[in-house]
């Protein structure tokens, strides 16, 4: 199986950094991506909810095509009132 184009020449090792509750935030994700691993965070770490779009703006503006991609952990449980809004923002910002 070959490496998908999104990862080719962008990863130093094939690792996804754990999306740590409360701990993971844009600066950590940017550092992870620049180190050559997939940076990730739970969308619910962005509080209040309007903060999530600011986080995606920061990631989109500071990461380049040479950095590893990032991932958003969306909580799809029925008790998450932000799911639809957060998913729409992921689509808007073309989260890899």
Please give the residue ranges for each predicted region.
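Active-site entrance/lid segments in N-terminal catalytic domains of soluble metabolic enzymes
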Residues: 1-96
